[in-house]
Amino acid sequence: MTSVDINNNNNNNNNSNSNIIETKLIGHKDTVLCISSHNKKEIIASGSDDCTVRIWDLNTNKSIQSIVEGFQGNPVNNVCFDQDFTLYCSYDNIIVSFDLRQPNVILKEFNTQYKFNTEEINQLSFDSKYQYLAACDDSGQTKIIDVTKNKLVESLNKKHTNIATGCVFRPNSKNELITSSMDFSIIHWDFLKAKVLHRDTFKEGSLPQNISKSQQQQQETTEPNRMLNPPFVTSVDCSNNSKYVAISMGDGTIVINEISSFKQYLKINSIHKSSIQQVHYPKYLENNYQRLISFGNYDKKIVIWDVSEDMNTKVSSSLLSNDEKNNERIKTWLEHSEKINCLTTSNLKNNAIFVADLSNDLKLLSIQ
């Protein structure tokens, strides 16, 4: 097995309002593209441009297994654990699964292969019972696979008119899924019936209704990104209480909707100086609907927000957001040393963020 070096240091390259300890998990030979944490085991998986996947032990921060074949020489764009011992990986439009119970340190053979998607897959996501796997792709479609039967059960298509950027199941629901797209919209589905329950569209250049000219001028001043970047939806995530869906957009905006009504719960404008790449509810919090993590596409800034009901009441007296209100919400922020590809957290490791950036090293950021 390739040796793995661990470097622990105070993150002097980062500007931050908290003490951040950065640990490098060294093993990949090219950029890390994706990360997934296991909900029951203290392990994470990472996929890379080096066309391999590594499994990491969170107790030692060392690589304990690597998957070096099965991807036909393609970068691994997505990884996703089931509840037991199987890891699902995607490259191009293909999904393959691996049994991690194998005693081998280096894995070469996959268990199952799915070729239901027609274009490159952008996200893999499991439902709460780990029966259904969703895979959204560049065609705008999302495929629903029953992994217990190894068959396609539904294709969610003809509703998104551009790339499907994200898919997430509503926790503890029987049949609800939310997808996001570059067509400026998110859709709330009954995925077993391929039925649209709700749709929210964030059209380019749209402004709230019934605002004054001075308010519009203020929005143009405080939301310069909206004038430059269209509000395509880059990611979605659901809170673990099943009540909220968080949405990140290309104009630097974060929106949270109540899922049942699909009405807007809150909106945060223009903290990132670029499009927002991802929003993520931290898994290490029991009530994670009170906090939200975001990072920008090019500004390299990671922000942890207070999105609790108490804070929302405090700052919602005005229709329009501003820097002062944003500062009230910010619990932690840091400027990472590299452009970030994705991040995740683990319910088994408190106050820790795992970051995949343009370097070859997976980063563990421990918030003190």
Curated annotation (Swiss-Prot):
It comes from Dictyostelium discoideum (Social amoeba). InterPro entries: WD40/YVTN_repeat-like_dom_sf (IPR015943), WD40_repeat_CS (IPR019775), WD40_repeat_dom_sf (IPR036322), WD40_rpt (IPR001680), WDR53 (IPR042453). WD repeats lie at residues 27-66, 71-108, 116-155, 159-199, 228-267, 271-315. The keyword Repeat applies. Pfam families: WD40. PANTHER family: WD REPEAT-CONTAINING PROTEIN 53 (PTHR44666:SF1). The keyword Repeat applies. PROSITE patterns: WD_REPEATS_1, WD_REPEATS_2, WD_REPEATS_REGION. Residues 207-231 are annotated as: Disordered. This is WD repeat-containing protein 53 homolog. The lineage of its organism: Eukaryota, Amoebozoa, Evosea, Eumycetozoa, Dictyostelia. Keywords: Repeat, WD repeat. Belongs to the WD repeat WDR53 family.
